[in-house]
Structure formats: C-alpha cells, structure tokens
Amino acid sequence: MALLSEELSSILPNPDFDDEEEDYVERETSHADERQIGVKFHIPPYGQRKGWFPSSPEDFGDGGAFPEIHVAQYPLDMGRKRSAKSAGNTLALQVTSSGAVDYNAIARQGHEHGELVQASFRDLIPLRARLGVGEISLEKPSDEQKQEVANKTKLALQKILSKQIAQSQPKSAVVQQRDDPVYIRYTPSNQMGQALSKQRIIKMVTAEQDPMEPPKFRHKKVPRGPPSPPPPVLHSPPRKVSAQEQQDWQIPPSISNWKNPKGYTIPLDKRLAADGRGLNDVEINDGFAKFSEALYTVERQAREEVRYRAIMRQKMAEKEKQEKEQRLFMLAQKAREDRMGRNAASSGPSHAKPRSTSVSSEERSRSRAGSFSHHSESENEDEDSEAFRRRQELRRERRRQAEKDLRLSRMGAEKRAKLAEKDRPRDVAERVALGLSKPSMSSDTMIDSRLFNQASGLGSGFQDEDSYNVYDKPWRAAPSSTLYRPGATLSRQVDASAELERITSESRYDVLGNAHKKFKGSDEVVESRAGPVTFEKDIADPFGVDTFLNNVSSKKT
C-alpha cells in the first residue's frame, strides 16, 4: 500500500486543496467567530441587567424575551409587522482579532469585494515602508496567470456587449428559435386500482408563435438605482468656520438692473454688491495728479500776472488822469491870469500895466476881506464869481452823472435794457408808429379846404393847371416855422465872429446818428476821412495771455 500511494503521488499532480488545511482554517474561523460573538453579544447575567436593553436579534439567543426589561421586544422578529421597513443600510457591529471595533465595514459598504478602499492610516503608507514588506511577492505574473486574466476580461466584455446588442434590438419583433424536439418516455402510474397502462414515448416540440402577435405584457423601464458611493479620502478633521470665512463664502443673489417682477425693495448696497464692480481694484495713475497740480500751478501764476498787470494798468491810468487834471488846472490858471492881465491893461495906462496887475490882485484879495471896492476890482470879482458858478454847475453835473452811472450799475439787466432803449434816439418811422411825432391838433390842420364850397376847391378845378402841389397847405407847418429862427433869449449885441465860431463848433445834430455818450478819448482820435471806409483788423491775442502761457510751457519743458 505504501508503494502504491507513492506511485500514485508521483503520477498525479499536486492537490489544490488539503483537507487538513481546511480543517485548520475552519477551526480558526470558528474560534474567531466565537471570540467575535463573545465580544459582540455579551448579555449580562440575571439581576445585573439594569440599564441594559436588547438591541439586536442576537441578544435574544435561541428565543425568549426578558420580562424584567420593560421595553418592546421582538425575539427572533416574532410579533413584528412584516410591512414595517427593515433597517436597510444598518450594519452589524464587528470587531477585530484584538477585540477593537472594526469601522472599516462602513467605508467598504456599497463597493465591490476586490475594490481598494482607504479605510485606515495603514492604507496611506507606501508598500516599501510597511512592516512585513518582504512577505509580499513583487514578481511578474506567469504566462498562465496572464492568460487566465485575459480570458476573464474577454468574457466580461462579451457579456457587456451582448447585453447592449440585445437592448438595441426591437422588443416588439418576435424571433422564434427552433429547438430540437425532446423525446420523453412516459410511464403512467397506477392510480385508484386501475390497470397499468403501457409506456408511451412523447415527443415535445416548441409551440409555434405568431410573429405578428402583439406583446402580452407591458414592459416598464425600471429606473436606474443610485450609484455606489465614492471611496472616502482621508483628510484633516473638520474645524469651526470663522465669521470672516462665512462672509467670504457668502454669494449675493443675482439682482437685475432692468427687471423686478416681484416688486421687491432692494437696498442700494445689495444692488451694488450684486453688480460686482466693487470687487475690482481701481488703480489711479500718478500722472493724473501731477498733471492736475501742474495745471493748477500754471493757472495760479497766470492769474497772479494778470492781476499785477491790471494793477499796473490802473495805476498808470490814475497817474495819467492826475497829470491831465494838473495840466488842465495849469491851463485854467494861465488863462485866468491872462484874462486878469488884459482887464488891467484896458482899465489903466500902458506904462502902468504891471503895477495895475499887482494892485488888482491885492485889491481883489482886499475886496474879499471887505476893506474897499473899486470899479476894476468889482469887474474881476464878477468874472471870478461867474467862473466859480460855472465850476460849481459842472461839479453838480458830474455828481449827477456819477450817481446815474451808479444807479445803472446796480440795476438789473432787464431794467437797464429798457432804460437804454428809452434813451436811444428813434428814427422817424418809429416815432410815427409810437405817436411821438404827432403834430399839434390845430383847427387849420384838422380840416381840408377842398371839402368846402369855395373858389379854390375841387368844384372849380382845385388849383391852377400849371401848379403841381397836391396839398393846399404844407405838412407840420407850425413846427417848421421855428426850426431855424433864433430864440428871443439871445442877446442882440453879439460879436459876429464869436457867434460864428460858436455855431460852427457846436455839435447840434450829433444825436441823429451818434450815441449820446462817447468813449473817452474818441474826440482826439477822430480824423478826417477821404476815400472808402477802412476797418481795423482784429487782434488774436490783445492781452498777450497765449504768448505768456507758451513761454511758461517752453521754459518748463
């Protein structure tokens, strides 16, 4: 027998399974289960069950409840309603070989058996750094293993493809597959004391099916179930979120600038926050500030120089005015002295002229004091008093004119325009339209002699044949009779040469074409013109501001 077993062992291949090894594995598994059960389902003895409640069917053992524990108990699910939903995803508590609770089952729930799931810190350690790395074989697989894996992969792919091809085919079309007939030997049994029948051979064939027959059942598409949860990725434990992080993660709602169908009242800060413009950082170039500062500096310098020029111009005008007044004063004084000298020469002899002049001045001063009076001194005093009155009248006229100018400067624009329109000289057409040139209504001008029965009327031929005048009387005869007639106030004893000079120098008709007031110095500039009218060309920069700015900019550059 020993030789036979040795020969058989040499001929037969090595066994894949060993009974002794299986017995050893079964014993280890049973011990582990007993240890697991002992740890997992520990029931305290009677009398020490205060605070303990059965939570799983294993707590009841073979059956039977605990009467001293007053809770709802269902030993072996007896008395539980079948319609009630089961626990579902509840997992049974498991322990490791050391007795600790195994939480890896929670991570592996919903995954296939061979899928790699990181469930502990040990899974994160590389293989080369783990303990017992030498026990793991890192050799390449053999050809048999490669072929076996390839066959499994091929079968899996064929299964998937066949399923997809079957789904793509139409469901309504019936394709009958003819199978080979099956022959069955049928032997009837003896029933109710009947005689045995003979054996028969039955031929079973597939029943014919109408291909145009509509389907008998309604196929419903079952919705796809939820996918398996992704494997967990180990990360740091969660921490409390700060208020700043919550504010950063807060996303404002989308607010339209055009539509508000609900009619909500949205604050301006929320509307601006939804716009997103405040998130952009606005960067302002320094060149703008430098450019603005340079412009401000140049403008200030230009204003200062313009102000200085205006002050200098004002001072020069005042100085010129003072010089003119001084010159006029000197001319007036010289004329007064000349007049006084002529009066003294006409009253006394020619050889006593200087003495009489000096005496007249002394006597005039004495007459003001009230010492005595003389004929020549009285005449000089009369002339001085008349000149003084004229000067006083001129001063009053200037004062009235200054007051009028002051009132005009304080008037509004509309009132000043009305006053200027009122003072402006009107032509004949405007005066006729306004009724200002209406003649005095006399009895002679209100009637027409042609309407009466008289010898010179229309009945007698109106007038002579050789006369061409249309009207019997001139128009506005009363005013025209006094236009060029000298007034009664004029003195009859007038020097002819002096009167002629006065009439020629008088600007009597300037009001018809010129303004009442002229610009200062316009009389000196007026020159006699010969030929066509000439115009002055406009000056582009009368005050030289553009030239000054160009010079300043050229100096800076």
Curated annotation (Swiss-Prot):
GO terms for molecular function: molecular adaptor activity; RNA binding. Residues 16-25 have a biased composition (Acidic residues). The modification Phosphoserine is found at residues 228, 236, 376. Residues 316-327, 386-430 have a biased composition (Basic and acidic residues). Its main location: nucleus. Residues 1-32, 208-243, 316-444 are annotated as: Disordered. Keywords: mRNA processing, mRNA splicing, Nucleus, Phosphoprotein, Spliceosome. The keyword Nucleus applies. Residues 224-235 have a biased composition (Pro residues). GO terms for cellular component: nucleus; post-mRNA release spliceosomal complex; Prp19 complex; spliceosomal complex. Pfam families: SKIP_SNW. Transmembrane segments: none annotated. GO terms for biological process: mRNA cis splicing, via spliceosome. It is found in: Nucleus. It comes from the Eukaryota. Homodimer. Interacts with cyp1 and the small 23 kDa subunit of the splicing factor U2AF (u2af23). Belongs to the SNW family. Involved in pre-mRNA splicing. This is Pre-mRNA-processing protein 45. It comes from Schizosaccharomyces pombe (strain 972 / ATCC 24843) (Fission yeast).
